[in-house]
Amino acid sequence: MYAQITYFYRRKMSLINDFLSLIYPRQCSACNRLLYAHETHLCNLCAVSLPRSGFEGQRNNELELIFAGRVPVEAATSFLLFEKTGRVQQVLHKIKYHGDKDLAQELGKMYGRELAGQASLGELHMIIPVPLHPKKLKERGFNQSEAFA
């Protein structure tokens, strides 16, 4: 009996979501293509083709050199390469200025899956978010790097 109720509930929710997609189509946060049912925030093409930094496990990478002498850092890396007017900028703007916390969490999960397969990371145990200035936190309502981490 429980299985039948669950089936009908899922079917009903699927129909409701399909109807809502006609009125409010879900779009990729990077390229604005329509999303398939199994895609959440990014289409599969963007999920695999957003430009990665490739800094993982690389000593004295560009990001570490930026921090050198300013703050004590054991290692630094980044997930994506930012280019003005690029798809990464569009994604980051949706997170920062449109409050898309779910998108930040999705990117964090993507990065976590990629990091899990990296043997060269050694003793990496956590990702630490960059603190956000209280004024910016009040403006945006959340720390986007914390949602990512």
Identify the function of each model-found stretch:
Residues 1-149:
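Glycine-rich phosphate/pyrophosphate-handling loop used in enzymes and phosphotransfer proteins
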